[in-house]
A protein has these predicted regions:
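Long, charged/polar, soluble alpha-helical segments
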Residues: 1-132
Length: 132
């Protein structure tokens, strides 16, 4: 962390906590829609991915992780439901693990966001194939 005052740090941490709660809600909604094959699955996954992207940005700002460049191994061809479930598990680990290792928690958060982006693209491709 940099020359940030404790007030600024507390403010960022409270914003991060709120963003993580919002991301958790959106991932739960995406999981629900994906498991029920709802018509707006792709949109639900996209909202969850965007919430995780925002949380990831706040996480990076809060803990000064500019130098951490996680390597994400994308799983192409994986069904959306599995990717959403795995994202939820990674988000859970990020929320619980940030007291132990902020770098590991950040990697989990980035991985979850990238899995959701892959799930969204897979869902869009699936929708486009149905239209053809």
């Amino acid at each position: 962390m940099s020359d940030r005052s404790s007030v600024e740090q507390e403010y960022l941490e409270s914003k991060l906590e709120s963003a993580l709660d919002d991301a958790w809600s959106k991932v739960n909604i995406a999981l629900d829609k994906t498991s029920k094959s709802s018509a707006d699955v792709a949109m639900g996954i996209w909202f969850a991915a965007e919430a995780l992207e925002y949380s990831s940005l706040l996480f990076n700002l809060t803990y000064g992780l500019e130098d951490v460049k996680p390597t994400i191994k994308l799983r192409k061809g994986e069904v959306a439901l599995v990717l959403v479930k795995d994202s939820m598990e990674l988000l859970k680990r990020a929320r619980e693990g940030r007291k132990r290792s902020v770098a590991d928690a950040y990697v989990n958060l980035r991985t979850a966001a990238d899995f959701l982006k892959a799930a969204h693209l897979e869902q869009v491709r699936k929708s486009n194939k149905k239209r053809e």
